């Protein structure tokens, strides 16, 4: 009897609906007018309504995902947005260092995709070491992302 109740409680606990972890992607991007050549053939087109409605091409592979972030702090970004100051794992840090060491990539936009929403396309202004600021989170997204990191 006790064994049966234990199994029942275990199955009930496993059946709880937990919210899906928030997906984060940082992706190289270019304004569509700045893209010439076959290297952009596999990039996707994004109509970004923020910032005056600009069309971007974004790389098919992200530079970073939520799995490259090991810790974060949340700051107020103004205009009802939040900034996530993220510390990167070794793989993400190495990848961003290599990307940002190429001066051609500096001052070029990086697309930030949060879930299914393109949050912004801010330029990469400085070389990245092991930390990066991600702008454009809503308060709810920033809080959920912080919980997701704590639950890993």
Where are these regions (language model features)?
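Sec-dependent bacterial lipoprotein signal peptides
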Residues: 1-12
């Amino acid at each position: 009897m006790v064994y049966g109740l234990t199994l029942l409680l275990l199955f009930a606990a496993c059946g709880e609906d937990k919210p899906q972890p928030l997906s984060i992607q940082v992706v190289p991007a270019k304004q569509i007018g700045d893209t010439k050549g076959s290297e952009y053939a596999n990039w996707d087109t994004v109509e970004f309504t923020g910032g005056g409605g600009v069309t971007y091409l974004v790389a098919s592979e992200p530079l970073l995902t939520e799995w490259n972030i090991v810790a974060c702090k949340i700051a107020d970004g103004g205009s009802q947005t939040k900034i996530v100051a993220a510390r990167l794992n070794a793989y993400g840090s190495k990848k961003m260092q290599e990307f940002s060491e190429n001066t051609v990539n500096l001052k070029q936009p990086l697309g930030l995709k949060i879930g299914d929403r393109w949050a912004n396309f801010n330029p990469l202004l400085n070389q990245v070491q092991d930390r990066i600021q991600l702008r454009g989170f809503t308060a709810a997204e920033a809080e959920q992302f912080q919980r997701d990191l704590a639950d890993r």
